[in-house]
Amino acid sequence: SGDSGIIYCLTRKSVEQVCYDLRNEGFSVTRYHAGLSDEERKENQENFIYGKRQIMVATNAFGMGIDKPDVRFVIHYNMPKNMESYYQEAGRAGRDGEPSECILYYEPRDVRTNRLFIENGEENSELDEETRKIVKERDLDRLKQMTFYCFTSECLRQYILNYFGEKSSSYCGNCLNCQTQFEEVDITLEANTILRCLDALDWNYGAATVIDIVHGGKSQKILGKNLDKNPEYAVLSERTVPRLRQILR
């Protein structure tokens, strides 16, 4: 449509791949991340700001101090690490007051990637050990709140306002959740089965193995480690694996 937009990715590799794919599809696109030279970053940024390129694909290194009021969409190709980052980046859409769109994609590996960044963050290397521990716990909690945002069925604007301490009980009517009718489903049986399975494993196995057990998998890992003797083995065999993954999240 010719609209200007920003696509945020977690890693340089994702930026390169998304930019490559869009360019092959004929889109006017450029990129921005810390792995590029200062000269290329500056050139790409100016090409986007002055309309020579329609789409900017970037890591969170892009955006500070950028004044481009006609950004019509902001897409998060990956979930950011906290609500603060998301709010700031999504807020770059529609600064001219015209209708704009923000889209957030999520998959479980985004949580793992962000957790890895938090665990191995070099920006806190100058802090003492006790302070680093406090900062890491804070960042992990913020990551949890960001993940909750991806799964909530409440008004997304309301969630953001409440997160930042501005209590709101009204619905915006614009977000996907406000425009979607949700059906409540009782998953007590599934949840309790998964919890009992984890207890029997002393919580020593990951999600994929737990799902394999309760679904009745016969992989070499399951049979070789006698995990088919778990009391919850195959209890949820009639559920689909994607559904069990969704519940376990």
What residue ranges belong to the model's regions?
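Helicase motor core with emphasis on the C-terminal RecA-like subdomain
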Residues: 1-130, 141, 166-170, 177
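Conserved phosphate/pyrophosphate-binding and hydrolysis machinery centered on Walker-type P-loop NTPases
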Residues: 8-12, 34, 38, 132-136, ...
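Short glycine-enriched loops at secondary-structure junctions
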Residues: 13, 108, 160, 216-217
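Short Gly/charged-rich anion-binding patches and loops
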Residues: 17, 43, 145, 209, ...
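Short helix-to-turn junction characteristic of helix-turn-helix DNA-binding domains
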Residues: 48, 150, 198-202
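Accessory DNA-binding and partner-docking regions appended to nucleic-acid-acting proteins
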Residues: 113, 124-128, 138-139, 156-158, ...
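C-terminal accessory regions
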Residues: 139-167
